């Protein structure tokens, strides 16, 4: 399906940024799966219809299990639909890091899990599997991590060596086809890029074809462990033998994942490059600046566009996100000659302290509750690998080395300083933001597009005035653990700086771990207008 016509790149001035909408969401649409009846019993409930959940559901159905997928929004509407969609086992410089810290065997186990995920995707796509394959615009492509700094050559060479030892198709190169100078790079050959929504929508269709059920618009609020497991949701209860939490950020606090995950956001733009960059056909990551580049198929008969990611920041930080988008657009103009931006969106992810995802039992003694999270911005292969491993764990066929490596409850003394820093940042926000907001009474009348957190009586209110001058007011406390929210002016959302929950201007949950919406409240009273001074009758000059 073609994108909406009013988003054509040539209909906007060079300096205009479009409203946030991912290229993937604009170019692939799925059926409505809302308002469907909830079954009473199934073998497996999968919570979340992103790449982890749909991969696990597909495998479990093929293994003879009955499966229900519950999705709070819509299929591929979360993180998986806002990625750059690099399908690669190259995850920055992870192989040298894993080898140095844990040994070559751990690096090999990690890498082989990513290659297995890559192969599973490629094997099912059109042009690879023959008739009946999924058409997800998959293109075989090389992947590069590069640097423009001469001093980084040693790091890149060590990564290439460690990746080769781990069985990766890696090499160190000094020549790239980028239109700006580089000092060197690590190249992985035989990787891929695809359209994530087309892939996931096709998986969803396949799941239903195999007898599985998918229901959108249903938010899971609680899971009671036992025999059977009881899943509570906004649509009622379901009994299951196994439950997989595949919600990107785990929604149940019992695993204490919120103390061990670092949330981040990146901004993404898409546009037509200058001729000197129009030949780019591979995937590129700048080691120093974290800018990521990949091509994507053109629309409206226009040339291919480039997707550019950058401006890495911690979710909920009090900063001007719109200004960050402008900075990313300026970088793309300078380096790649992108004049017009056709789409922009943001990508959210979480990382673990050791860089290895959490895939396995939700808590140490859990028997039938499972989780996959912490992919550190490499969710296309990392999330697929998690879905494959979760299905193997439930079936009792998981390889021991993968089960141990990705165990969510592994412990490494070397992660303690990072954990302490992570939670000190949360504590600083919890206390400091509360104090700052409590001292902020409503002192100004909001203009259209403006927002503030202010004290009204004994409560903190998050208020936003839209373009029609309607004030939307909600509680300023995140419903997860009560942190004070910050306004994201680019996406008109209230974001939590503690654990990355996000809410729209009327309080609906956009991202977890929060599962409850913000309470809507009365708008703060407008501050009194200053009185005009009466200095007597006006003086007339003659």
Model-derived features with residue positions:
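Helical element adjacent to the flavin cofactor pocket in flavoenzyme catalytic cores
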Residues: 154, 161-164, 185-241
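Rieske [2Fe-2S] iron-sulfur-binding domain
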Residues: 269, 452-529
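Flavin (FAD/FMN) cofactor-binding and adjacent substrate-gating region
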Residues: 3-27, 93-99, 123-202
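C-terminal catalytic lobe of FAD-dependent flavoproteins
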Residues: 287-288, 314-419, 474
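N-terminal Rossmann-like FAD-binding beta1-loop-alpha1 element of flavoenzymes
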Residues: 42-69
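Flavin-dependent oxidoreductases
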Residues: 222-298, 429, 438, 443-444
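Extreme N-terminal leader/targeting segments of oxidoreductases
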Residues: 1-44, 519-521, 531
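Glycine-rich FAD pyrophosphate-binding loop
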Residues: 62-82
